[in-house]
């Protein structure tokens, strides 16, 4: 079963949030799962929704009013959310359609006309804010975006990660960053600058990798691309001197992460900046007059999606390495069960990670492994814990859903393994 979290300390936090809402004239406050880069997986520093609710799933939106607290998530997490919200004031709201803003419908139904809903402008994109404003306006409800209430309440908030980045050699990338930059600039169509906020796109474009986000080899940063040069906004302490020199030779200067705001003001004072409304935060958008922004399509994703010859061959190598690790796990598990041992789901996951780590170029899991034995294999996004994981016997089915990050590429595999005789129903 999903690990329960302690909710005993959440009442004072909710009280503090409600007091801050009252002081700022807010009738409700939205806490999403995103970070300023709209990442699927976010660093601990941006896990405000998890910190406030105790729910550890990757997708969900919390809403707090003066008298109620709610969490919306999809069917992947219903069982987990029910367990982790138990004993708290938060009530689970089950999304009927994943990735939709059903919390806005609820706000329209339960808040009076003239109410104000607050949120953190860093965590909402331009398109999300526009959509929310339109929906709330139907009931004469205002959306107020410049409310950073969590910042003052989260006393032990983890700092932004400071893991060192490294360069992905061309032997793995198959294309130099200067060639990639040239390809992107050819698509800028007269826009003086183009702002890139997605962490995976920056990593691909610059041929760099990081370790700022669990299971994702990315570095928290922004990239402002000009006609002939580029500015990479990142904690400079994370960039080795040798990499800084290499970047500078390629026309890329390293700037402080927080410097993105001033750089946009300077560039936007005389030039236009291309952006994507579904990617850019309201916080950055509102730094400039609307006329200085130019809506563009995603210039990186189409290029990133087409694998070059080197990448294709490297993906085969990554899958081969992953296959070796999986076969070694099968052999280990087979021997363990034959000798009468009963390893736990958690131990199997740790063992698989260990076999992957033996492969050249491995630097982490691509997502937390899902190892579910018997009925646990039917729990969506099941996560085995060391103290509660089921013991595996030489019977029934074992689900393995896992992957690895290699310099060659990323893997994601799902296997269902029969550990003994199975019924005709299972075979079908």
Task: Give the location of each predicted region.
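Active-site neighborhoods and metal-handling regions in enzymes and metal-associated proteins
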Residues: 1-428
């Amino acid at each position: 079963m999903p690990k329960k979290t302690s909710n005993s300390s959440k009442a004072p936090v909710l009280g503090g949030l409600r007091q801050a809402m009252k002081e700022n004239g807010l009738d409700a406050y939205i806490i999403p799962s995103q970070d300023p880069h709209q990442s699927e997986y976010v660093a601990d520093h941006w896990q405000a929704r998890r910190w406030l609710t105790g729910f550890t799933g990757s997708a969900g939106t919390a809403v707090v009013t003066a008298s109620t607290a709610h969490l919306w998530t999809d069917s992947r997490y219903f069982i987990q959310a029910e367990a982790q919200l138990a004993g708290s004031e938060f009530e689970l709201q089950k999304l009927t359609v994943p990735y939709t803003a059903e919390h806005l419908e609820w706000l329209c139904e339960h808040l009076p006309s003239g109410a104000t809903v607050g949120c953190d402008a860093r965590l909402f994109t331009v398109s999300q804010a526009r959509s929310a404003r339109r929906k709330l306006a139907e009931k004469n409800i205002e959306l107020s975006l410049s409310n950073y209430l969590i910042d003052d309440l989260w006393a032990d908030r983890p700092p932004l990660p400071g893991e060192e980045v490294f360069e992905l050699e061309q032997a793995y990338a198959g294309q130099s960053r200067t060639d990639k930059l040239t390809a992107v600039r050819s698509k800028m169509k007269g826009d003086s600058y183009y702002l890139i906020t997605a962490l995976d796109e920056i990593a691909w474009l610059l041929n760099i990798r990081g370790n700022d986000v669990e299971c994702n080899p990315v570095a928290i940063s922004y990239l402002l691309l000009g006609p002939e040069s580029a500015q990479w906004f990142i904690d400079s302490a994370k960039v080795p001197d040798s990499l800084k020199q290499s970047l500078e030779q390629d026309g890329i200067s390293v700037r402080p992460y927080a410097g993105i705001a001033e750089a946009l003001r300077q560039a936007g004072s005389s030039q236009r900046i291309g952006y994507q409304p579904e990617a850019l935060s309201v916080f950055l958008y509102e730094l400039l007059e609307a006329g200085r922004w130019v809506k563009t399509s995603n210039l990186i994703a189409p290029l990133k999606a087409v694998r070059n010859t080197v990448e294709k061959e490297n993906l085969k190598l990554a899958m081969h390495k992953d296959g070796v690790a999986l076969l070694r796990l099968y052999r280990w598990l087979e021997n363990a069960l034959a000798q009468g041992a009963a390893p736990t789901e958690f131990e199997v996951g740790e063992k698989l990670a260990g076999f992957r780590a033996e492969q050249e170029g491995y630097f982490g899991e691509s997502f937390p492994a899902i190892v579910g034995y018997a009925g646990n294999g039917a729990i969506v996004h099941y996560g085995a814990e060391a103290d509660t994981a089921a013991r595996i016997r030489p019977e029934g089915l074992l689900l393995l859903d896992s992957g690895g990050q290699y310099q060659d590429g990323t893997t994601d595999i799902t296997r269902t393994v029969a550990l003994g005789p199975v019924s005709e129903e299972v075979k079908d």
